[in-house]
Amino acid sequence: MEERYSEYGDIFRTNSNSLFPFIYFCNPKAIQQIFTADPDTFTSGGTNGILQYYVGRNSLLLQDGDRHKRQKKLLMPPFHGDRMRKYGDLIYNITSNVISHWKIEQPFPIRKLTQEISLKVILRAVFGLDQQGKSYEKLRVLMSDLLDSMSSPLSSTFLFFNFLRKDWGPWSPWGRFLRKKQELHELIIAEIQTAKKEGNHRDDILSLLLEARDEAGNAMSDEEIKDELLTMLFAGHETTASALAWALYWIDMIPSVGEKLMAELATIPSNSDQVAITKLPYLSAICQETLRIYPIAMNAFPRVVQKPIEIMGYQLEPGMVAIVPIYLTHHREDIYPEPKKFKPERFLERQFSPYEYLPFGGGSRRCIGSAFALFEMKLVLATILSQWELKLLPNQRISPVRRGLTMAPPANMRMVVKPKKSWQKVSQPILTSG
């Protein structure tokens, strides 16, 4: 896509396998028009049809119109307000527990570490599951297996071609996928039933969804809740893990970045809580720059034109597909000078509009878990780096690989744990209670 952008500029088209062309808009003015257009101008849920095999047909990602509005309102409360403080305790405790088992000078794959942390956080936050329980271990294994099935173009080929989606038994790729998915669905339905029996004694996201009511006073069905929980698991685990791994990579790769971050962490008063940690300017800038240079997804969700609209002089007709390329927008030289360089300072020097910086998409389709994802990133990084120093092993060739929908670091990217000198340590940077 970078070649097409270099050749054709802000607006270019590609011929896809569909009947209508895909039109890419890289200019912030065009992006603003798309994100703020009348809701009836575009639909997006139908273009995500391939995701139904993972998240189910009731997922917010697959909805449009009034149904999308209803689901989004029902799902918003767990990701805002005072809930964040409770998540802070959870994130800190899980991260502290994981890194307490580290061995000095012993190399390890960093992506595996961040996957472990993010999966434990999401399972605890969503289901209230303790890692010692059987349900936790079953969910962990099933999630890992299903994510592996979409981790590369080769392994996920069957999703794109109908003739490959044939169940020839448990040893065939599609048959194995279907059985793993069914196991996961049954396990989640069982957790929903357990949560119903336990009533108000829980504080996880599942319990909040059971209590949620729309404007007519109706609750979500078990199938709707199941599919939304699946969406949270798939959208919130691998994406955060990849972003964390990239952040740790850049912090060590550019020594001045790590030095500035440590200096900032050292200024934290001993009585600070988790929310105060997440407001640190340079820590925030590091997370923002990480998501700029390697965004969670290459493109925002495609939008299918439903009625004629003109975008920067380009006439779109019904059936055409408008795409906002996040990666290309984040690498515009006129917005981000030296876009291939990791420079957190750019986020301290100016504020970017939501049409220039859009790691979580935009408009009505913006990711509802964006605040949670950033909150988790900041707390995990602060917890780790206030106590330990992580160094990349030398002579590694690091380049992004596809992992589901994300641009992840390679699985073999390895780091080593080194103890901090006494003057480098931050004394109790995050409290264990909000």
Residue ranges and their predicted role:
Residues V324-R350, V426, L431:
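Conserved cytochrome P450 K-helix/beta-meander segment immediately N-terminal to the heme-binding cysteine loop
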Residues G88-Y92, K138-L146, N200-S207, W250-A297, ...:
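Cytochrome P450 I-helix active-site segment
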Residues M1-R70, R85, D89-N97, K180, ...:
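N-terminal membrane-proximal hinge/A-helix region immediately C-terminal to the signal-anchor transmembrane segment
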Residues T43-Q52, R67, R83-S242, K260, ...:
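Cytochrome P450 heme-thiolate monooxygenase catalytic core
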Residues R70, L230, A235, Q274-V275, ...:
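Cytochrome P450 heme-thiolate "Cys pocket" and heme-binding signature region
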Residues Y5, T95, I99, V141-S144, ...:
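Cytochrome P450 proximal C-terminal region
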Residues G169-P173, L283-N299, R303, P410-G434:
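C-terminal domain-closing interface element
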Residues T239-E264, A371-S386:
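Cytochrome P450 catalytic-core helices
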